[in-house]
Amino acid sequence: MAKEIVGGFKFDQRHGKERVRVARVWKTKKGGYFIVEWRVGISLLSDCVNSYVRDDNSDIVATDTMKNTVYAKAKECSEILSVEDFAILLAKHFISFYKQVTAAIVNIVEKPWERVSVDGQPHEHGFKLGSERHTAEAIVQKSGALQLTSGIEGLSLLKTTKSGFEGFIRDKYTALPETHERMLATEVTALWRYSYESLYSIPQKPLYFTDKYLEVKKVLADTFFGPPNVGVYSPSVQNTLYLMAKAHSSIQLKMPNIHFLPVNISNKDGPIVKFDDDVYFPTDEPHGSIQASLSRLWSKL
């Protein structure tokens, strides 16, 4: 936040616009179509303290102006670009166009529209909604300094075997049985920060950050599942999270359990349903919450 000393108080302030939804369609050189849908949030750090303490709005960028800018800049983008590049583009505009703005924070969530295939062929203009979401946040200072973070939200992963949980603390409150055979499911949230520290250092390759996002998603999924024919055993969500994290240079991971509880039902006459690793009750409340961050001392993304 922009910090001031006002009337003997430390005063932090910022203002912005949230949940600006924009979709952009491009016609490709090959004649097909491409679409993105973004939810944009903007925060501006600026020299507008007078609007708070002296009823003077002359230094304020109206939040409605910020909203309009999102659509105007989307219109100006004649080529397909990544969510990271659009976040940087917006932030760069605000710090360069307005002398009052000292820093801009732009965060974007991309809705996962995926091209459909019909009869094994990619459709020219047909898309379906996927699940996991690509996120990005760009923080740009007046000096051109940059902090760029990308992420994944809602990456749901499940394997029906090759998981267990044994050897944990047992006391008078423990009811959970140990097992070396269970289903493992989670919804991954991941964040990673790039090492580019200025606007002038970011790669100019088209869709560079989209390619990196797809690489990270693939490594996370491949590490979780293991080889296709044999898989890989998971002794705990914690261990699997660590193995997924250490495949990257620097990353934060959050992996709550999505529980599939064994179903055993009986009455006075005997079993109605006897569990044999086959019938489960899915539930996500309450759930375990496992998270960690890992950063190599010698490397950055």
From Swiss-Prot:
SUPFAM superfamilies cross-referenced by the UniProt entry: Tetrahydrobiopterin biosynthesis enzymes-like
GO molecular function: urate oxidase activity
Location in or out of the cell: Peroxisome
One GO process term, biological-process aspect: nodulation
Predominant location category: other
Pathway: Purine metabolism; urate degradation; (S)-allantoin from urate: step 1/3
Catalytic residue positions: K17 (charge relay system), T63 (charge relay system), H259 (charge relay system)
Secretion signal span: none
Keyword Oxidoreductase: yes
Transmembrane segments: none
Superkingdom of the source species: Eukaryota
UniProt EC number: 1.7.3.3
Gene Ontology cellular-component terms listed: peroxisome
Key words, A-Z: Nodulation, Oxidoreductase, Peroxisome, Purine metabolism
Catalytic activity: urate + O2 + H2O = 5-hydroxyisourate + H2O2
Motif (Microbody targeting signal): 299-301
Chain positions recorded as urate binding sites: T63, D64, F165, R182, V237, Q238, N257
Keyword Mitochondrion tagged: no
InterPro entries: Uricase (IPR002042), Uricase_CS (IPR019842)
Annotated NCBIfam families: urate_oxi
PANTHER family referenced in this protein's UniProt entry, alphabetically: URICASE (PTHR42874:SF1)
Job description of the protein: Catalyzes the oxidation of uric acid to 5-hydroxyisourate, which is further processed to form (S)-allantoin.
Protein family according to the UniProt entry: Belongs to the uricase family.
Name of the protein: Uricase-2 isozyme 2
